[in-house]
């Protein structure tokens, strides 16, 4: 079996970690960095870029640079807010209402799972290079408040990337593993996880190798991206008031504003004020226009006050669900880069009466926890038991459009529960089972996970047939549902996979497509290496010709020069098949040329050779 890694697939950045020498450690990527931007781009030449290299070219290629895609994974277009779709790239929907991301460079539409898969593939490839062994399996983290569709979609992204996802675990739970692995005494910890696009709060009992989640709450549409957007809107309005130009119509300007907003937000975590300087942001008939704006931490906090206040609700909800007072919390662990914002740290301290524990790196702790879970599954770490919970209630639609809950939120998983139902009308011979997830009383306010039908019910009076509906949630938090008519024993079951928006054939096609691009990239890299090798060889050959032109036969010199010309021509025209052959020919010609050089006796030229021994 290959190495199992832990992956934090983040909205803004992703991290991969593994167990080395019995300890979890973050794996450095190909660029030498510990975090990889969750960004995928396709250039005008249809070249795939992932990570830092994709981020660097975002300003000049905004329409084909895809970031914050995690916000769309496993969701329908109707479920996404209009604000979330205000991006430099186009977010559209297919005929089934599924989200698609338009790539004008390839004239193609991608699912969010495909884009996420490209990030996963890079992480896996970098881990393989770093560890020196194949990586084929992974534990991937998701926000605790991800629903069944989003979890299944994350599994699909893993499949498309060509990796077997052994386990999906919640990000705050992973963070608690990293924090509490060596804790012997029992502690109640609150994990406050504010990342780039999602927000989770989990309360856990940790100690003696047991990690039990007591409650979880969150908001999958709140994160650092939203703070950036507030700053972008502020900059756009200030510029329009001053210059009368609306920058929202210029996607390159918007991309520059977004990058500047993120940079300013990060700087304000350590300084009281910063200056946003964007020369040549646009131009009109009077000439070029620039932005130079001072932003204080106080102004930033005022602008983002609503977002900061939204962080309060899940904390209070988690405490209520866990039946705990703030005084019962022993430690508060901060996770996610956005927890570096001083106003967030102050909010957490006021809500819990505890100074947040900052002994863990908020950017890396989730991946470290995922690596620990990977180590547990691979047998590298023993005596650790993880008891997670389902974040949202699950149930079925019953008469009158009501949701009847079968598994309540914050139930420890894996779990299996059954409820008895009957028919609503006389002589009813089939029932439609509509599976739902959420906390609202009525069907309309909850997430529909899927439908299936149980046929063959014996005709009888209303309320007589007994239909047992069983919900089964596995360790990944994924659901399967079974309905059984007790008199006849007829049953029908379904694994809720349609919720992921992709069927098996689509996932297979996307995997093939991803592998094709991986092969193309490998070929492209080999061709670049061949060009570099050819140029180096030509340089060496020219040097040899220059050094020994008087002592090498003319026909051999002409042969080498002709080969150099042909190689440079093939390099210009990208004729790689011919180039490969010519490089080998030049190597042989150079060897032949060197062997044709007359031997020079070095002793004859030694100025000391005529001296007699003393």
From Swiss-Prot:
| SUPFAM superfamilies membership | Actin-like ATPase domain, Heat shock protein 70kD (HSP70), peptide-binding domain
Source taxon at top rank: Eukaryota
One Gene Ontology term of the molecular function aspect: ATP binding
Cellular location of this protein?
A: Plastid, Chloroplast
Q: Which Pfam families match?
A: HSP70
What InterPro entries does this protein map onto? Answer: ATPase_NBD, Chaperone_DnaK, Heat_shock_70_CS, HSP70_peptide-bd_sf, Hsp_70_fam
* GO cellular component: a single term: chloroplast
Per UniProt, which keywords does this protein have? ATP-binding, Chaperone, Chloroplast, Nucleotide-binding, Plastid, Stress response
Task of the protein: Acts as a chaperone.
| Record HAMAP family | DnaK
Family affiliation? Belongs to the heat shock protein 70 family.
NCBIfam families assigned to the protein according to its UniProt record, in alphabetical order: PRK00290.1, PRK05183.1, prok_dnaK
Name of the protein: Chaperone protein dnaK
Q: What lineage is on file?
A: Eukaryota, Sar, Stramenopiles, Ochrophyta, Bacillariophyta
